[in-house]
């Protein structure tokens, strides 16, 4: 079997004597990030200590303007258009226009989260999909759900290496396996870093040469720590073949409201892909929730109070992520500097010998299990994102350290020095103590 293709795992019978299962193969395991979130909740309910650093939830309360907008539309009980209501699509189009990308409202499709739109796009495009290694957990799983192969291509900061991508696509097609799309994450989850414009341009060149549709997941684009740093989207280089997705779960911390939007490609491909995506949407989610669409239209119109909220969120995420990165680095891990969102991606390989001798750790799963079992620190092994488990990498999320109440979270949001707040400082001290003992 091609090692770059994610296989489907068989479902075992529930009992040894039960005979063959009537179910088919498992196309996707339970999401590791959502499983980690439920595990953390279960530990809390049992009264066990938890330092929640596994789940990438933005960890801040909804802005009052958005709560009011949601409540005011509670009577919107009809289904509405599959693509989303016109005010939302017009607001989303204006969001991209303010970023230098003129967009027609007809090029926008809304869905119940960008996650659903990503799956819908894979199903609409068909064929195999090239995915960066490492990358967000759900890309490969969604490809499997759509009955497609996910071809894992080495890369960094959410963008597959251009040369490796070209070779992977050529080899797959030569063996009769079509590859029709490539997914990039800008900025990246799990690494919390941002790809260079040259890397994005090189990927676009390969996509043009091999006729690949680019799906650019830009859910973290508004949470770049340095807003002045150059940011390159594939749509700037290949607008006729790039779909851009985003949503409100990260920049405005509305993960539970489930609202995302896709900007379809310019040129002839956009209307064709729109028709196919709406076909998928009509059979799966019908339409996004009406009240949420009303609040989202306000969000994408970007009134000053909401842009200020995003600015403060970006500052908070950056300061806490950098503080955690410094602690991990001081403990001996190799840590890329966080550039966006609320993720840190330490590599404990420099400590592999000591970890093996002291704790019997030989994989990233071992390390993550030890941290939660012995110290109550919940993180994810990088192998959940496609890495080899022998590399002792972890994905550390920092956004649930901001407090247990809305009052604490708002204090963190407005603080010039959030890491000095007692509840955040206590979490950082707990991390320091575990790292010291780990060595």
Where are the model-predicted features located?
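PLP-dependent enzyme catalytic core of the Aspartate aminotransferase-like
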Residues: 2-4, 102, 356-358, 370-379, ...
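N-terminal small-domain helix-loop-helix segment of the aminotransferase-like
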Residues: 11-112, 120, 302-303, 402-405, ...
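Hydrophobic residues in well-ordered beta-strands that form the structural core
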Residues: 131, 152, 214-216, 296, ...
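Active-site phosphate-binding strand-loop segment of PLP-dependent enzymes
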Residues: 157-230
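Conserved glycine-rich beta-strand-loop-beta hairpin in the small C-terminal domain of fold type I
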Residues: 314-325, 335-354
């Amino acid at each position: 079997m091609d090692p770059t293709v994610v296989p489907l795992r068989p479902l075992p019978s529930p009992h040894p004597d039960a005979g063959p299962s009537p179910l088919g193969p498992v196309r996707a395991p339970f999401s590791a990030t959502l499983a980690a979130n439920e595990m953390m909740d279960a530990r809390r309910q049992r009264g066990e200590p938890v330092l929640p650093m596994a789940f990438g939830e933005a960890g801040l309360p909804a802005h009052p303007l958005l709560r009011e907008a949601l409540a005011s539309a509670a009577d919107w009980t009809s289904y509405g258009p599959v693509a989303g209501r016109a005010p939302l699509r017009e607001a989303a189009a204006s969001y991209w226009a303010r970023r230098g990308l003129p967009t027609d409202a007809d090029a926008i499709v809304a869905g119940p989260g960008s996650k659903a739109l990503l799956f819908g796009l894979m199903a609409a495009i068909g064929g195999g999909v090239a995915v960066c290694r490492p990358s967000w957990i759900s890309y490969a799983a969604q490809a499997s759900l759509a009955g497609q192969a996910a071809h894992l291509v080495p890369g960094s900061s959410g963008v597959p290496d251009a040369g490796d991508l070209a070779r992977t696509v050529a080899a797959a097609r030569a063996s009769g396996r079509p590859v029709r799309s490539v997914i990039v994450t800008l900025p990246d989850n799990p690494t919390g870093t941002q790809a260079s414009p040259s890397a994005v341009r090189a990927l676009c060149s390969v996509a043009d040469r091999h006729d690949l549709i680019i799906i650019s997941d830009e859910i973290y684009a508004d949470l770049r720590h340095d807003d002045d740093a150059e940011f390159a989207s594939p749509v700037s280089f290949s607008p006729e073949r790039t779909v851009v997705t985003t949503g409100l779960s990260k920049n405005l911390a509305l993960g539970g409201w489930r609202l995302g939007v896709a900007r379809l490609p310019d040129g002839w491909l956009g209307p064709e892909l729109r028709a196919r995506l709406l076909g998928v949407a009509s059979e799966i989610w019908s339409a996004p929730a009406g009240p949420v669409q009303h609040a989202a239209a306000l969000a994408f119109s970007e009134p000053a109070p909401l842009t200020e909220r995003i600015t403060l969120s970006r500052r908070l995420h950056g300061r806490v992520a950098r503080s955690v990165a410094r602690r991990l680095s001081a403990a001996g891990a190799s840590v890329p500097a966080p550039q966006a969102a609320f993720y840190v991606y330490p590599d404990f390989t420099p400590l592999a010998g000591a970890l093996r001798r002291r704790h019997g750790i030989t994989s990233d799963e071992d390390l993550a299990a030890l941290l939660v079992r012995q110290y109550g620190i919940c993180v994810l092994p990088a192998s959940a994102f496609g890495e080899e488990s022998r590399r002792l990498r972890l994905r550390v999320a920092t956004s649930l350290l901001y407090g247990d109440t809305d009052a604490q979270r708002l204090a963190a949001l407005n603080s010039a020095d959030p890491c000095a707040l007692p509840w955040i400082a206590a979490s950082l001290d707990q991390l320091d103590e575990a790292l010291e003992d780990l060595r």
